[in-house]
Amino acid sequence: VRDGYIMIKDTNCKFSCNIFKKWEYCSPLCQSKGAETGYCYNFGCWCLDLPDDVPVYGDRGVICRTR
């Protein structure tokens, strides 16, 4: 398992979030990816205890591509 920023599948960009709602959005989103929990950190959803097969922002070769 590992921690990291989960990404939007089509763009490889981080899921953005509201830091004033630290857990409300990110925790359920991270849990849907198999993480224990998650929270908003530096305006992105940071997930704790993700399965190793879930790609995270910063993995080798991962580039955020906006349209």
Curated annotation (Swiss-Prot):
<dbReference type="InterPro" id="IPR003614">
    <property type="entry name" value="Scorpion_toxin-like"/>
</dbReference>
<feature type="disulfide bond">
    <location>
        <begin position="17"/>
        <end position="40"/>
    </location>
</feature>
<keyword id="KW-0800">Toxin</keyword>
<dbReference type="GO" id="GO:0005576">
    <property type="term" value="C:extracellular region"/>
</dbReference>
<keyword id="KW-0738">Voltage-gated sodium channel impairing toxin</keyword>
<dbReference type="InterPro" id="IPR018218">
    <property type="entry name" value="Scorpion_toxinL"/>
</dbReference>
<comment type="function">
    <text>Alpha toxins bind voltage-independently at site-3 of sodium channels (Nav) and inhibit the inactivation of the activated channels, thereby blocking neuronal transmission.</text>
</comment>
<dbReference type="GO" id="GO:0006952">
    <property type="term" value="P:defense response"/>
</dbReference>
<feature type="propeptide" description="Removed by a carboxypeptidase">
    <location>
        <position position="67"/>
    </location>
</feature>
<keyword id="KW-0872">Ion channel impairing toxin</keyword>
<comment type="similarity">
    <text>Belongs to the long (4 C-C) scorpion toxin superfamily. Sodium channel inhibitor family. Alpha subfamily.</text>
</comment>
<feature type="disulfide bond">
    <location>
        <begin position="30"/>
        <end position="47"/>
    </location>
</feature>
<dbReference type="InterPro" id="IPR036574">
    <property type="entry name" value="Scorpion_toxin-like_sf"/>
</dbReference>
<dbReference type="InterPro" id="IPR044062">
    <property type="entry name" value="LCN-type_CS_alpha_beta_dom"/>
</dbReference>
<feature type="domain" description="LCN-type CS-alpha/beta">
    <location>
        <begin position="2"/>
        <end position="65"/>
    </location>
</feature>
<dbReference type="Pfam" id="PF00537">
    <property type="entry name" value="Toxin_3"/>
</dbReference>
<keyword id="KW-0528">Neurotoxin</keyword>
<dbReference type="GO" id="GO:0090729">
    <property type="term" value="F:toxin activity"/>
</dbReference>
<dbReference type="InterPro" id="IPR002061">
    <property type="entry name" value="Scorpion_toxinL/defensin"/>
</dbReference>
<feature type="disulfide bond">
    <location>
        <begin position="26"/>
        <end position="45"/>
    </location>
</feature>
<feature type="disulfide bond">
    <location>
        <begin position="13"/>
        <end position="64"/>
    </location>
</feature>
<protein>
    <recommendedName>
        <fullName>Putative sodium channel alpha-toxin Acra5</fullName>
    </recommendedName>
</protein>
<dbReference type="GO" id="GO:0019871">
    <property type="term" value="F:sodium channel inhibitor activity"/>
</dbReference>
<keyword id="KW-1015">Disulfide bond</keyword>
<keyword id="KW-0964">Secreted</keyword>
